[in-house]
Every structure is written in C-alpha cells, then in structure tokens.
Amino acid sequence: MDRLRLLPMDLPTITVSTIGNTKSKSSFVRRLTVGFVILAVLGLLYVPAYHSAQSPFLGETPSPAESPGSLHSLASVAQLPGWSYNTSRDLCVYIHPGNTTSILSPTGICSLPPYLLIIVCSAVANQEARTAIRSTWANKYNLDNLYNFTVKVAFLLGQSDNDTLNNLIVEESSQYNDIVQERFLDTYNNLTLKSVMMLKWVMSNCDQTKYLMKTDDDMFVNIPLLLQTLHSKPKTETLLGSLICNARPILDPKNKWYMPKYMYSEKTYPNYLSGTGYVMSMGVASKLYQAALVTPLLHLEDVYITGLCAKRAKVRPVNHPGFGYGPRKMDPCVLRNAITTHKVNASNMYVIWIKVNNASVICNNRTRVDRKSITLSRSSRNAGYYVFKKKTINRLCAISIVSLWIISL
C-alpha cells in the first residue's frame, strides 16, 4: 500500500523528464535541419564558383561524372604522355648546356646587339603563321627602319617526325635566316624544353641583348608600344607579362593541363606569367636559365619558367595590363593600347595589322581598354587552371562561420 501511494508522487518527476527529453530532441532536430539547409546553400554557391573558375577561352573542364576523389586517385597513378614517373626530369640530360645543340641558327642576327630580341615559339607545321608574322608586326623593313631601337625577331622550332616537314624548314631557314631549330620532338608536352632551349641559345648567341621576349605564333605583338613601355620604365631586373595568381594544378588526366602529383604535389602554383607572351631583361634570362638547370622539369612551360624557376632565382614576375592571354575586340583603339593579342590566326594577323596602322582612325587621349577581355581575365585569372575569386572565398568563409555558430546553439 505504501508503494502504491508513492507511485503517483513519482509520476510528475517522470513526466518532467519526458518533456525535457522531448524538448532536447526537438532542439537537436531543429539544429540539424538548419545545418542541412546551410550546407545546401553553401553547395549552391560553391558549384557555380567552381565552374566559373574554368577557362572562358579554352573551355576544357573535368567531366561532371568524375568526383573530386576519383580525380585525386587518378592523379597519383596516371602517367603524363612523354613524361612518365620514371622519366628523368633533369634538364641537363636534354639541354646539354656545355654543347651546341641547334640544328639551324640564323647568322649575324645579333652582330649588332639588339635592344629587343623577340623569340616566337612556333610549331614545325605552322609555316602560314610564320609568313603572316613576317608580313605584319615582324616586317623586316619596319624592324630595320622605323624604330629608334634595334629589334630582331626569330622563330624557335623543334623537330618533326615527318622528314618532309623538316626539309621544308631547312628551305624556309635558307630563305629568311630567322629560324632556330633544336634537337627535340616538337610536341605540346615538350614546350618547357623549347623555352629552356631558347634561353640557352640566347645566352650563347645574343647575350648582349638588353631585353628578351618569348611569345607564340598565334600572337600579335605591338612592338612600338612594347618599346615605349620598356624605355619609359627601365629596370635592371624585368620579368613582365600577364600575371596569374593562386592557380591550382588540374588533377584530371583527360585535361590538356593535367598535372600529375609525381611532378608537382603542392596545392597551388607560384605566381607566374602567361606563356603567351612575357619579357625579361638579360640578367633575368641568365638567372632563369641557371635555375632551370637545377629545377626538376615541369611540362607547363609558363608555370615552370616564370613561376618555379623565377622563384628559385628570386625574381618577381610583374603584371602589366598591356599583356593578355585572350582575344581582343577588333577595335583599332583597343588594339593600339594592347602589347599582345592572343588567338590570332594568319588571316586575322593582317586584319589587326591594318587596323593598328590605319592613320585615318583617330583615337582620343583616353586609353581605350577592352573591357570584355579584362572581365574574362578577372573571372578566370588563368586559362585552364582552377582559380576562385577572393570575394567568393570570403563569402564562403563567412557563411561557414555563421553555420557553425547556429549549429552550436
């Protein structure tokens, strides 16, 4: 009987405990729901930010079907064509720094030391592009007569596995005396070899040059504006171009810019200049060449030369708005204010040349800028590498902090 009396007295205690547990569970469910909602919002922000970071010019992105985990797994095992895990990346093996390795070399090009030497990296088969360049911005008459400084232009090529093409290069060299050909197979993954061969050849044949420019055969170079830029701001150490910051290696083996982890394991590349066109003083060229001889090869030429080698040589790459790695508006006043224009085929080389030199077009005193090119450049600081805008990262960080605070309530 005493026990029966005690039961009702214990019931309120049990009831209160149940209500407390119910409230606790309700609070936990609410926090969990809020957490899921915030994670969903983060996901919606993250996905467009990720995709907007891909190249607006080249459009090569990883397949949506591949998860980041699978890309990281593949990156540790997938071999880069021509540069497998066991392939030596010691440049001295290929460059032979103590020997002359060039098959073809222009004679007398630096008998009078140039103020500016432009080396155009060209593919063996791209004769039409070289002809267009010789007829426009590298026109020999203009180079010899119109500028207050000595400017020389030469084309750098590797070898083809097609003997017919190699024979045509010999004929072209005999006709124009402006071709440097080195002993390596001219492929995309050998572009670093090509640029280091450029440094070697210049150091051996044109070491009294004041400035060296490296560019490609799909580029229009505004030589008068480049000369004006170099002369107005002379520096003993110059490494100038379109600066790319905080770029991340691509881990998708199907991508053109795939970087296997056995070649580069860091999360980001050092700041570097777009390989479409950059200029250096000869002192810097010498430092970069010496750094390359002791830096393991990386097949991405611009990352290697102006990033890794520049970092080792303690040379800082500097951005200049006149350089760009995208196409520009075909506006004469825009083109006149651009040092380099990218993605120019042979026919457009003539079109741009005519527009730039059309005396009937008068540009006002204000510098006209290609806003579209700048917008593209800012939204994807490097064509082909994963980059996030600083503003987007700050937003994601802020939302993450708020999320953690709410969940902890």
Briefly describe each language-model feature range.
Residues 2-409:
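Secretory-pathway lumenal glyco-enzymes, predominantly type II signal-anchor Golgi glycosyltransferases
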